[in-house]
Amino acid sequence: MQTRFGFSYYPGCSVEGMNKAYDKSTQLVCRALGIDLAELDDWNCCGASAYMSIDEMKAHLLSARNLALAEKEKKDLVVVCPACLTTLTKTNHYLAEGSKFKKTIGAALKAADLQYFGSIKVRHLLDVIVNDVGEQEVRSKIKMKLSGLKVAPYYGCQLTRPFGEVDDKEFPVILDKLLEWIGAEPVDFPLKAKCCGGLLMMTNEDVGLGLTKNLLACAQQNGAECIITICPLCHMNVETYQGDVNKMFGTDFKIPTLYFTQLMGLAFGFSRKELGIDEEMIPSRPLLEKHLEVMG
């Protein structure tokens, strides 16, 4: 496939560590769509989550280093983790607005033989596929029908907040659009931009499991056969903790969970093995075999 778009690629710690299937499917889908992702050399943690709460300035330093590395490559930065998107974008905004950290960050970058002029835009892959690649190109790659597959499009709480640059903060539709383009049927999912519980699973598990239970119940009540995610932490909570939710609340959830790039990859004709789908905890094979059909 001829390259049509080129970006620096920031996998982030979650994808690099526990979510290899997200990276596998991302690489395959991007190759099919002519998106060249050049992994950022020597990238480091973005400073998201707990680090930002403990020492905000040092967290921004981590993000600023990644932005400076991307600027050296003269390409905008694509991420697949909304937490990384939020943290990197927040640092970008702070530096552009001349925040109290700007001088300290500039000095730290200089000590590492780096500098940052603010030319890099950080984008989520979903945004790139929908707004740069577009519907026609996506539809042209489809080889398998997802006949009647009802999906709950789950955005999580960080893709659109706090900046609202990707879509509406409360009622995003960008993932719904993409899922329709590849032949799936997004169901009404009122909690699609609500928190999954995040790191509360480590600090206040009862509250975290309650939030996850609400998401699973909402998806099930609205007829979803699987949940489609764009965030590695959301994916882990929604899939991995279903057993814990069932024990705590007496429920019986067994809802398969897939990354949006995995579902795209299936529609594009890639195998489950290539996309890392058979590595999941809640098997989706029976569901996918029921709905997948070769395009006539």
Q: What is the predicted role of each segment?
A:
Residues 1-296:
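Iron-sulfur cluster-binding electron-transfer modules in prokaryotic oxidoreductases
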